[in-house]
């Protein structure tokens, strides 16, 4: 049976490892003023030279977390401006940097969609639980909604070296077919700037 999802939706917070309560609090980081390119809500990000950039450009990049929104003082109006995503390039007033809000709990669980069937059988799919995957083949987002359309790249599985570790099916009733594309999965960071490389 096909899943209802027909596209990716990035990474959506969904509890924490160990089934402990998740505060889903956000930490403040900076995006360098006038940085070109978009960074979407639900996109994995990392820190380079002190600034937030995408972590979806390399299968072995170590994310700091997932972008949830930004804040800056608009250059033309000088008004405080909150946004769902970074619509690059943004140059704030007074030569300031853009503040970004990132879910950086390395034990945060996320729901994401697969780009393909996890396996041809349910038993085969279960055998891939706790393997690691990247998301580099299917990134981007909507410049209308600002939402990421990243999916988990099922073709790049490895026991230890990829960014995201598949924990289980998210048991989303309309997107629970592991033998079809766009099933909803639960993942956790395998590579992290905070807790090591996962190897």
Functional labels for PLM-detected ranges:
Residues 1-199:
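Surface-exposed, low-hydrophobicity beta-strand/loop segments enriched in small/polar/acidic residues
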């Amino acid at each position: 049976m096909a899943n209802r999802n027909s596209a990716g939706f990035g990474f959506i917070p969904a509890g924490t490892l160990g089934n402990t309560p998740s505060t889903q609090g956000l930490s403040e980081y900076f995006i360098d003023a006038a940085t070109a390119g978009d960074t979407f809500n639900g996109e994995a990000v990392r820190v380079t030279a002190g600034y937030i950039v995408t972590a979806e450009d390399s299968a072995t990049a170590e994310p700091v977390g997932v972008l949830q929104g930004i804040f800056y003082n608009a250059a033309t109006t000088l008004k405080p401006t909150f946004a769902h995503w970074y619509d690059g390039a943004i140059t704030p007033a007074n030569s300031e940097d853009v503040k970004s809000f990132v879910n950086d709990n390395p034990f945060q669980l996320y729901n994401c969609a697969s780009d393909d069937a996890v396996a041809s059988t349910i038993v085969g799919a279960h055998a891939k639980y706790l393997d690691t995957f990247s998301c580099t083949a299917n990134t981007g987002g909507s410049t209308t909604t600002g939402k990421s359309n990243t999916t988990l790249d099922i073709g790049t599985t490895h026991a230890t070296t990829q960014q995201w570790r598949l924990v289980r099916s998210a048991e989303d009733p309309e997107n629970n077919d592991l033998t079809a594309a766009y099933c909803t999965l639960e993942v956790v960071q395998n590579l992290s700037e905070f807790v090591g490389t996962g190897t």
